[in-house]
């Protein structure tokens, strides 16, 4: 353990040897010179007297994450480092060092300035004393005007004025000196700026006027008598009682707040004064005044100015009585205008009175609100520090730097472990040997002590072996911090000796830096909650008016929220305004004319990109859209179920129906089939060849689609189905021969969707061929149900089939149909089937979505015009 301590000491010394005895910790001068040559930074060690405490400084690692490390408190060669003042942003040091007595000096200066300029508490007693002195001087100056009290009052006035001059002079000097606590009054220029204030100029004028009066005294010469009149200038000292001009500010604010009302009252009063004075002057100007003997004297209203004087005294309710109207006309005019003018002349007094009362109340409330500033500022500061001490925010280091600069810990110097465990060191043993040659490549390094170079104190008794908990805790904290510092500094240099530096694991009890951060975090949380509680206490209402205002504000906020909620509800459940874009208007020459009741949203020939912009974005519109989609899905499912039912019915048909002996059935069986209304409908069925080669594995790609006719599934049927009429003969002629038979899977599926067209334009006898049966009720219900679906086979072209995502759509060209009243083709030629790879629902324009155009669904066209096509699919 001692070897590791000596190695750490040698590394800290910058090349010191590992020798034992008294020179184990001494630095090598040569090694120190070589290290100093490549390093220009300062070296930090421990100065005498700083051995008991160290400050927590910013980590020296490259990450600069605010790690708390130990740093010595002094310079090299025992020089104490002078703390530099840091600017507000903790970036630029102040140029002047801060003196030790500056804090006390500034505190006294601020205290005097507040007592003189902003008196509170005990300072009010001094200002009350000054007021009594000024009032006494004023009373004695008044008594000197009496002949009987002139001598006595003059003597007392001289003594009191002399005392007042000294008091006011000292106060003025203290004001000039204490003004330096304010930033704008610093220095001699700031003092001159403070002396140029109006109240300071008034103090200077009163002092200058009082000095000659006191110097002359009570002499009876002419000079003394003339100077005594300056004593009444002391009346101006009453103005200095309000140093901050609060009364004048209050009056000015009241006048400014009610300026419009005051101007209105004064304007109407002035008009009343002019009009009443002029009318009284016209009536009374030629009436002479009579004395007691009845002799005529000059007129009382000789000029218009006399009338204005009378009007002002009368309307102001003073009424000296020196001028009065003599005639009844003048008295009537004076009475009429007095009733009007007096009210307007007295109105400004009421306005100012109410305004002053409101301002005083507002000032009291403002003082109450000012009490919230400090708790609010403390809460903001505590909230920020609580946020900044979050361990997950590694980018916030300012708060940790603050704690690094203010938090300090007791320091126990590092020594040989044997000596630390065997005895308690004295004061001299805790003094670090200065090491002027010690250096390190990083410059800023901790230099541990070595007790081998210090003589052991003989006054200390040996202690039992072992460290107590307090020493172990402090030693572990210092050793861990030093080891982390060393590792962070030597990480970039790649020093091979870095692994040997540090201390034994026996003393590394725990990592103190995270523990310290956690403790600071806990303190910040407690302070945040405390300041939050204090701030809530200051939010209590000041008076009933505050309570009413709070309720009013809450009521307005509630109304605004209710209005916002109502707006949201209206937007959710109210459909949007109808929109009619330009591209949805009917064009001339178009194939179809859309009805007016049809929604543009359901127009089949409008692209999705166009309809999405005009869709109703309200919740009700979305509900309607979902409901329509569910309805469309139901129709599609009905269509698929119908297809499946047809397929299953086709497989259940008896095979013997297709042989010639089928017609030789018994009459009883024929009648039974006629009566059976639930027999399956005769459908188109593909027949597999029995004479051909064995069926190969089926694949959709084995049989090209161009080789299969529209009715190719009858190519291998040995039976030629015949029907009555010329159309059946023509249909049989068009059927391909069964000479070349080959095994293939049927490529078409029957559909009952279009059977309604067959029923409409064929008679019952035409539908019932030699191999046909009655239509079952279930099929009839399927026909009735599917006839309402907006599925159309006339509008799907092959381009739509190619871009269909599923490849399963109803395929039939609209050009293949021949519209006419007589479509005498056989029902065998009608293409009531689905081709493989086709569907009716994949293309966007023909997806069932509500009401479709009549031209698209065929509702407005007669059933007799539907004629199938002969073209292959």
UniProtKB/Swiss-Prot annotation:
<dbReference type="GO" id="GO:0034220">
    <property type="term" value="P:monoatomic ion transmembrane transport"/>
</dbReference>
<dbReference type="Pfam" id="PF11956">
    <property type="entry name" value="KCNQC3-Ank-G_bd"/>
</dbReference>
<dbReference type="GO" id="GO:0048167">
    <property type="term" value="P:regulation of synaptic plasticity"/>
</dbReference>
<dbReference type="GO" id="GO:0099610">
    <property type="term" value="P:action potential initiation"/>
</dbReference>
<dbReference type="GO" id="GO:0065003">
    <property type="term" value="P:protein-containing complex assembly"/>
</dbReference>
<dbReference type="GO" id="GO:0016322">
    <property type="term" value="P:neuron remodeling"/>
</dbReference>
<feature type="topological domain" description="Extracellular">
    <location>
        <begin position="145"/>
        <end position="154"/>
    </location>
</feature>
<keyword id="KW-0630">Potassium</keyword>
<feature type="transmembrane region" description="Helical; Name=Segment S6">
    <location>
        <begin position="328"/>
        <end position="354"/>
    </location>
</feature>
<comment type="subunit">
    <text>Heterotetramer with KCNQ2; forms heterotetrameric native M-channel responsible for the M-current. Interacts with calmodulin; the interaction is calcium-independent, constitutive and participates in the proper assembly of a functional M-channel. Heteromultimer with KCNQ5. May associate with KCNE2. Interacts with IQCJ-SCHIP1. Interacts (via the pore module) with SLC5A3/SMIT1; forms a coregulatory complex that alters ion selectivity, voltage dependence and gating kinetics of the channel.</text>
</comment>
<feature type="region of interest" description="Disordered">
    <location>
        <begin position="723"/>
        <end position="742"/>
    </location>
</feature>
<feature type="modified residue" description="Phosphothreonine">
    <location>
        <position position="82"/>
    </location>
</feature>
<dbReference type="GO" id="GO:0099611">
    <property type="term" value="P:regulation of action potential firing threshold"/>
</dbReference>
<dbReference type="GO" id="GO:0033268">
    <property type="term" value="C:node of Ranvier"/>
</dbReference>
<dbReference type="GO" id="GO:0008076">
    <property type="term" value="C:voltage-gated potassium channel complex"/>
</dbReference>
<feature type="topological domain" description="Extracellular">
    <location>
        <begin position="284"/>
        <end position="303"/>
    </location>
</feature>
<dbReference type="GO" id="GO:0021675">
    <property type="term" value="P:nerve development"/>
</dbReference>
<dbReference type="Pfam" id="PF00520">
    <property type="entry name" value="Ion_trans"/>
</dbReference>
<dbReference type="GO" id="GO:0009986">
    <property type="term" value="C:cell surface"/>
</dbReference>
<keyword id="KW-1003">Cell membrane</keyword>
<dbReference type="InterPro" id="IPR003937">
    <property type="entry name" value="K_chnl_volt-dep_KCNQ"/>
</dbReference>
<dbReference type="GO" id="GO:0098976">
    <property type="term" value="P:excitatory chemical synaptic transmission"/>
</dbReference>
<dbReference type="GO" id="GO:0005249">
    <property type="term" value="F:voltage-gated potassium channel activity"/>
</dbReference>
<keyword id="KW-0813">Transport</keyword>
<feature type="compositionally biased region" description="Gly residues">
    <location>
        <begin position="11"/>
        <end position="26"/>
    </location>
</feature>
<dbReference type="GO" id="GO:0022843">
    <property type="term" value="F:voltage-gated monoatomic cation channel activity"/>
</dbReference>
<dbReference type="GO" id="GO:0051882">
    <property type="term" value="P:mitochondrial depolarization"/>
</dbReference>
<feature type="topological domain" description="Cytoplasmic">
    <location>
        <begin position="246"/>
        <end position="257"/>
    </location>
</feature>
<feature type="transmembrane region" description="Helical; Name=Segment S2">
    <location>
        <begin position="155"/>
        <end position="176"/>
    </location>
</feature>
<feature type="compositionally biased region" description="Polar residues">
    <location>
        <begin position="725"/>
        <end position="741"/>
    </location>
</feature>
<dbReference type="GO" id="GO:0005886">
    <property type="term" value="C:plasma membrane"/>
</dbReference>
<dbReference type="GO" id="GO:0036343">
    <property type="term" value="P:psychomotor behavior"/>
</dbReference>
<dbReference type="GO" id="GO:0098977">
    <property type="term" value="P:inhibitory chemical synaptic transmission"/>
</dbReference>
<feature type="topological domain" description="Extracellular">
    <location>
        <begin position="215"/>
        <end position="226"/>
    </location>
</feature>
<feature type="binding site">
    <location>
        <position position="244"/>
    </location>
    <ligand>
        <name>a 1,2-diacyl-sn-glycero-3-phospho-(1D-myo-inositol-4,5-bisphosphate)</name>
    </ligand>
</feature>
<keyword id="KW-0832">Ubl conjugation</keyword>
<dbReference type="GO" id="GO:0010467">
    <property type="term" value="P:gene expression"/>
</dbReference>
<dbReference type="GO" id="GO:0005739">
    <property type="term" value="C:mitochondrion"/>
</dbReference>
<keyword id="KW-0472">Membrane</keyword>
<dbReference type="GO" id="GO:0006897">
    <property type="term" value="P:endocytosis"/>
</dbReference>
<feature type="compositionally biased region" description="Polar residues">
    <location>
        <begin position="588"/>
        <end position="601"/>
    </location>
</feature>
<protein>
    <recommendedName>
        <fullName>Potassium voltage-gated channel subfamily KQT member 3</fullName>
    </recommendedName>
</protein>
